[in-house]
Regions:
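Residues at secondary-structure transition points
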Residues: 17-20, 34, 38, 53, ...
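Acidic, PIN/NYN-like endoribonuclease modules and their adjacent C-terminal/linker elements
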Residues: 1-2, 106, 110-138
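Short, well-structured N-terminal submotif of metal-dependent ribonuclease cores
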Residues: 1-35, 47-64, 138
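Short, structured coil segments at secondary-structure junctions
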Residues: 29, 69, 127-128
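Residues that scaffold the ATP/ADP-binding catalytic core of kinase and kinase-like folds
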Residues: 12-13, 43-46, 84-87, 127, ...
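Alpha-helix capping/helix-boundary segments
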Residues: 9-10, 39, 80, 105, ...
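Active-site neighborhoods of divalent-metal-dependent phosphate/nucleic-acid chemistry enzymes
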Residues: 45-48, 71-119
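Generic structural signal for small/hydrophobic residues in well-ordered secondary structure
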Residues: 6-7, 22, 43, 84, ...
């Protein structure tokens, strides 16, 4: 099985007190883990909200993360755009909207047949995306 890591999961190793269960899970499965350019954008924004030494350290972490995940960062391309349109239509017609960034991540995951690893299970389950919560692992 392969996973698309959401920002709440991927950021755990960079946090002062990251969730040890999630960090162990990432380490155990890192070769089967992907992320998206949308998640990288979310993380880059998060880094920019920090100041001083913390910002410098997080920028270094993000640069190293992008390098380590080279070839496993999936973009929002034309194929994903068509999947996204289908997801958005489904969500709109059922009256269950999803945050736009999460809907892009969901479309990328569906396009590549990946399970989204996130603590935000509720939003990703609505459009029927395969979801795994590493925060709930024991």
């Amino acid at each position: 099985m392969s996973w698309l890591l959401d920002s709440d999961v991927l950021s755990q190793p960079a946090k002062k007190i990251g969730d040890a269960r999630v960090i162990r899970w990432i380490e155990k499965h890192q070769q089967q883990c992907y992320t998206s350019s949308i998640v990288i954008a979310q993380l880059a924004f998060w880094v920019r909200t920090k100041r001083g030494k913390q910002r410098v350290a997080l920028q270094k972490w993000l640069t190293e993360l992008v390098e380590a995940m080279r070839g496993r960062i999936l973009g929002f391309n034309v194929s994903a755009a068509h999947v996204w349109a289908d997801l958005q239509y489904q969500l709109q017609t059922t009256g269950k909207p999803m945050p736009v960034e999460d809907s892009y991540i969901a479309a990328i995951a569906r396009r590549h047949n990946l399970t989204v690893a996130t603590g935000n299970v509720k939003d990703f389950q609505r459009p029927g995306i395969k979801v795994f919560d590493p925060f709930a692992e024991t």
